[in-house]
């Protein structure tokens, strides 16, 4: 899965049962964490400060209290200034309330470091989704733009392995979801390169499952795809998580619970795929605009304002880097040379930045990079200086 080791935004954890552990001194102190069960018992309103994530272990709630608890919790989550990762931790036999739409439903045996990594992954995914929606709203669609095969198609689930439970996975999926089977990891990667899948289930013996997951995760196109692994022994759960599983299904799962977990993974996978598609589309469009003199100042200003407001709701700042040649000690002697230098600077910034960072040419401004964190500006500055030191422009 994505290698994410730092939070996109920091804050307290809201938790019921399982309390995520911290791994960085930069995290909010533990005494700011919110025990949801305690707040529910007191009938209190939750703080307005945006949490880093919300984690609810369903076993911490007595059966008869669950509906009341979620009736109290969900409206308060909805009223938060921005969406945050929301997790339900469960087991094979737990009964999950209907109507929940968490970011993910995960086996409660997930190791602490994997849970933290998933929080990091999902935080970034939410930022990418916000960025995709913003670009579509500000820049619109590109007429006739074709999508990459792994972004195209209807909502689909890929089942990898020869367990003989293919019909069970079809039965557990929503009616409109197409379920496709693959014998092994190589076949899975081949299928995934030709059409979109929103989630993968690996239903194979432990050693094969690890091998198949690693084949999938090695391909950068599928690093963020939800992958659910099936196992028979509880002692294998942690190993599968650490080898790339987004969730692990152990033993016989209650049919309704299995459907909840599968559909949650599919929902997140589809959302991520659509965001990837829009970001890829806008990337091509922004590159095309270079030949037309760049993005208009009015469009760019509207983007900056909307993006800044969205990040501020999460306590984040927007970092704009003007990439004019003079900022790097370069002097252009002609308009043709200036165009070449701008192209070089944009190419360096494009290769160094993330998909959710905006890199473009703006009319009257020149090349710019709009980054979502300060570390990105330092990294980009160093990269540009390093390349320019060894490049004759």
Identify the role of each PLM range.
Residues 1-35, 40, 44-52, 75-82, ...:
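Non-catalytic signal-transmission and effector/linker regions of two-component phosphorelay proteins
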Residues 34-53, 61-62, 183-199:
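Acidic, metal-coordinating helix/loop segments flanking the phosphotransfer/catalytic sites
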Residues 63-82, 210-223:
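Short amphipathic alpha-helix used as the core "switch/output" element in two-component signaling
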Residues 66-72, 91-105, 211, 232-248:
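Alpha4 helix (beta4-alpha4-beta5 surface) of REC/receiver domains from two-component response regulators
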Residues 101-102, 113-143, 257-272, 278, ...:
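Receiver (REC) domain switch/output surface
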Residues 163, 298, 302, 313-336, ...:
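Catalytic-site or vestigial catalytic-site microsegments of nucleotide-handling domains
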Residues 290-317, 347-351:
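Short regulatory alpha-helical coupling segments
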Residues 327-329, 342-377:
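Conserved helix-loop-beta segment at the catalytic/binding core of cyclic-nucleotide signaling proteins
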